[in-house]
């Protein structure tokens, strides 16, 4: 009997070993993942730096928008200099790169040459169970050097960061300094002017707050603030003992801050050195006109506390990141194979980097995703819907964080429609919907889309928690939305859905499936709340609709794109929630039939979105791939995505909208929707429970929507009442902004000044030259001075003078009017009665516009 047991154990072990060997062999046959762009520093839509090349030395690093955000690293081995990161200095050769690995919290480059192996690791501790750490804007850059030839080597390294990382446009002036924090030293850079949360839009980078490059003085002996190109930089690269201070201010693209020092005298034992890259934005999001702090600042921490904590936690975080990466990658491999795991790691980094965690007035975590490279909207329902699987997987705090600010707005008096909103505004201003008809009318709204999204997501949170308590906070709104889908959901009218680039579509079959599942989810919520009558009503209705759907959408070996369009087809990605939420509304035959059709229909780089075009959506394919929960089906749809990533000619962060025949990007870069890649893990209830149960924060007790301040015109601008200004388009004398200047020879025209088609512009006088100078005398009552702010629309750089004193210098462009207090000198220059306002605006390209007024900003009533 014992011999039989030994034999059984031996056979079991042998089978396991053979399985692992086969798994390893299969992995060996898989080509390495070549990310279109490699994530290096991935925190939020502003602190997001990527390498758009196969090798770290083949291209300069960039912001996700493609604008230069240069990081450079050099190494000197036994007196010979080599590049590790960046293509500059071009006369310094690159150390050969031998490997690249992208993991959920780390990107690891390996280099070899001159008898040493060097790994350069970018660690962003995006640990989802620990929101305190996840929200910290700190990436650790670590060089680890090991000798390979039994010889001793003298190794020095540098890291350089461009001032561009702290500026929206390259010509913005930056100022820099160095500062000690205990045993740490930091080089610091930020814009001279700090327009906090002033700009909104898509192709925008941060120009407030400060970039920090911090290190232990025991590890790095030298620091430099220098010109980006010039002799001082060369001195630092040639002689690491030089310390150079730069005169401030300088243009952002002309500035570098650098640290350097000896790693060690390296033999065969690995030696490491680490620098922290951090960004303190102080305020991150404007929600209903209230500026919110980043979550890590909720208890009063500042940059000093951030850096000290980050330095103290490095070793423990390193271990935690290694453990997290290994465990998550193992779960991804088990769920979908090696290609899926690598795709998941890349998606994980990108998803969290396209949003921001902030604290509400109670210090509770809320988050806002950004619709990168589509229209810049913030808190968009049909963006956080595909993003949601990544947030749902890791627990209720993350899953609720983006719903709370959205639902507070949707349930407020401001949202007057019977369906869910589309968005909260334009990033980083979450001040109310801007898409389509906004709050004004139903033009280009997505009523069934957004309403179905919300009901499904509340159903998913209830599935995770086993109760509907969170839904109870917004029950009246959810009940209203369920009624809307009951009346309008089964056969949608001519309207947009999330795939709005494809245009309006009536009788959308996939949208109908979403509505049906939304109704089923609401029935489940009713059941969990103990309302059995409503639970039966909505569950029965959902089942009846599903049965009708199967009959009316049938088209032979598949189901249609639209009920009234035979011979058409589409991906039915919304069906995944039927199984994840255990609703069982649609028969399994639907998924099987669709999958068989998809597998014979897809192209080289993936399954098209529908029959109308060859383009596809990466996130939706990863959902569609899960429908049958068959591994062969799943891999059949995932493999072309992997091929696309490796072969697309577009070197930018992962797109979710591309052509399936030639792998070219159509649009959409670096969007959070790739969090949808994690949908496959939600089918495994044990895996979902494991990850969700680790939520340490378990947030609750969020504050209601903050009251909007009232903005009252004191000196109206053209958006309310055009006014007459004196203006000139030829450069005047230097005293043009002074109160005693004679502007009688200047022309007179109505505000605003610019060209038709400029976003948000109200044209009173055409201005189409590079520069314009404006003057106007205005009357300001004494009782309005206390809460007085400028009301500005500028495209591009403007200089605003108040009674001859420089009061504001807004840079770049905006797309609408906004309020901004004058600087301290400008406030001091204001007086009761008559005041002279003088403005200069400079234009370089595209639309152009300038207009200025004054408003009184009165706090809203609670």
Report each predicted region and the residues it spans.
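Acidic/polar, glycine-enriched structural segments that form the non-catalytic walls/loops
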Residues: 27-38, 128-133, 144-379, 397-400, ...
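Aromatic-rich carbohydrate-recognition surfaces in CAZymes
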Residues: 298-318, 376-491, 508-522, 526
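Aromatic-lined ligand-binding clefts that engage carbohydrates, nucleic acids, or primary amines
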Residues: 746, 770, 778-804, 837
């Amino acid at each position: 009997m014992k011999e039989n047991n030994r034999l059984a154990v031996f056979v079991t072990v042998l089978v396991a070993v053979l399985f692992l060997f086969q798994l390893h062999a299969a992995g060996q046959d898989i080509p390495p993942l070549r990310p279109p762009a490699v994530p290096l520093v991935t925190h939020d839509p502003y602190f997001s730096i990527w390498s758009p090349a196969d090798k770290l030395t083949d291209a300069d690093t960039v912001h996700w928008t493609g604008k230069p955000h240069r990081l450079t690293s050099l190494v000197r081995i036994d007196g010979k200099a080599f590049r590790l990161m960046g293509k500059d200095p071009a006369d310094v050769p690159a150390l050969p790169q031998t490997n690249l690995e992208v993991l959920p919290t780390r990107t690891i480059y390996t280099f070899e040459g001159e008898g040493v192996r060097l790994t350069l690791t970018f660690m962003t501790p995006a640990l989802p169970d620990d929101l305190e750490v996840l929200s910290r804007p700190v990436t650790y850059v670590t060089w680890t050097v090991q000798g390979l030839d039994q010889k001793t080597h003298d190794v020095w390294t540098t890291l350089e960061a461009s001032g561009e990382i702290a500026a929206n446009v390259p010509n913005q002036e930056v100022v820099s300094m160095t500062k000690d924090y205990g045993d740490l030293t930091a080089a610091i850079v930020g814009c001279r002017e700090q327009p906090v949360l002033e700009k909104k839009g898509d192709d925008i980078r941060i120009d407030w707050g400060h970039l920090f490059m911090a290190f232990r003085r025991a590890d790095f002996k030298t620091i430099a603030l220098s010109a980006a190109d010039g002799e001082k930089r060369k001195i630092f690269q040639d002689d690491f003992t030089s310390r150079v201070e730069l005169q401030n201010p300088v243009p952002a693209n002309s500035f570098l801050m650098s640290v350097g020092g000896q790693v060690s005298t390296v033999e065969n034992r690995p030696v490491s050195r680490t620098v922290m890259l951090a960004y303190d934005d102080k305020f991150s999001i404007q929600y209903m006109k209230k500026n919110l702090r980043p979550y890590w600042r909720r208890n009063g921490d500042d940059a000093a506390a951030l850096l000290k904590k980050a330095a103290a936690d490095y070793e423990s975080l390193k271990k935690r990141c290694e453990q997290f990466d290994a465990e998550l990658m193992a779960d991804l491999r088990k769920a979908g194979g090696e290609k899926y795991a690598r795709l998941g790691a890349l998606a994980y980094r990108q998803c969290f980097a396209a949003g921001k965690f902030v604290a509400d007035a109670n210090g509770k975590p809320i988050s806002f995703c950004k619709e990168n490279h589509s229209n810049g909207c913030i808190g968009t329902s049909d963006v956080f819907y595909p993003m949601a699987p990544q947030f749902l997987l890791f627990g209720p705090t993350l899953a609720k964080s983006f719903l709370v600010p959205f639902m507070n707005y949707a349930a407020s008096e401001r949202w007057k429609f019977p369906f869910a909103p589309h968005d909260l505004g334009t990033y980083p201003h979450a001040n109310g919907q801007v898409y389509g008809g906004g709050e004004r009318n139903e033009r280009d709204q997505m009523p069934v889309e957004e309403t179905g999204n919300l009901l499904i997501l509340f159903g998913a949170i209830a599935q995770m928690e086993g109760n509907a308590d969170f839904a109870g906070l917004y029950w009246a709104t959810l009940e209203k939305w369920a009624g809307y889908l009951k009346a309008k959901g089964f056969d949608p009218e001519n309207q947009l859905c999330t795939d709005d680039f494809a245009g309006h579509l009536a009788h959308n079959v996939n949208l109908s499936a979403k509505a049906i599942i939304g109704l089923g989810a609401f029935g489940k919520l009713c059941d969990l709340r103990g309302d059995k009558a409503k639970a039966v009503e909505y569950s029965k209705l959902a089942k009846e609709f599903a049965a009708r759907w199967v009959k009316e959408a049938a088209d032979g070996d598949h189901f249609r794109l639209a009920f009234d369009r035979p011979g058409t087809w589409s991906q039915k990605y919304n069906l995944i929630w039927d199984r994840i939420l255990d609703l069982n509304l649609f028969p399994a035959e639907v998924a099987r039939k669709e999958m068989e059709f998809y597998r014979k229909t897809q192209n080289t780089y993936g399954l098209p979105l529908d029959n109308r075009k060859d383009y596809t959506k990466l996130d939706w394919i990863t959902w569609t791939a899960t429908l049958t929960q068959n591994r062969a089906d799943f891999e059949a749809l995932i493999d072309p995505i992997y091929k696309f990533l490796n072969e697309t000619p577009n070197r930018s962060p992962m797109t979710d909208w591309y052509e399936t025949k030639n792998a070219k990007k159509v649009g959409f870069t670096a969007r959070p929707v790739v969090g949808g890649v994690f949908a496959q893990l939600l089918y495994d209830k044990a895996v979902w429970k494991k990850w969700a149960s680790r939520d340490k924060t378990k947030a609750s007790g969020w504050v209601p929507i903050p009251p909007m301040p009232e903005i009252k015109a004191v000196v109206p601008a053209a958006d309310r009442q055009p006014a007459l200004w004196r203006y000139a388009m030829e450069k005047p004398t230097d005293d043009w902004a002074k109160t005693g200047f004679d502007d009688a020879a200047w022309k007179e025209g109505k505000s605003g000044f610019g060209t038709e088609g400029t976003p948000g512009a109200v044209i009173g006088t055409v201005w189409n030259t590079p520069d314009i100078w404006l003057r106007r005398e205005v009357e300001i009552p004494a009782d309005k001075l206390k809460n007085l702010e400028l009301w500005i629309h500028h495209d591009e750089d403007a200089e605003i003078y108040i009674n001859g004193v420089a009061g504001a210098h807004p840079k770049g462009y905006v797309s609408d009017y906004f309020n901004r207090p004058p600087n301290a000198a400008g406030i001091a220059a204001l007086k009761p009665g008559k005041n002279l306002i003088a403005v200069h605006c400079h234009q370089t390209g595209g639309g152009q516009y300038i207009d200025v007024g004054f408003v009184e900003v009165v706090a809203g009533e609670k």
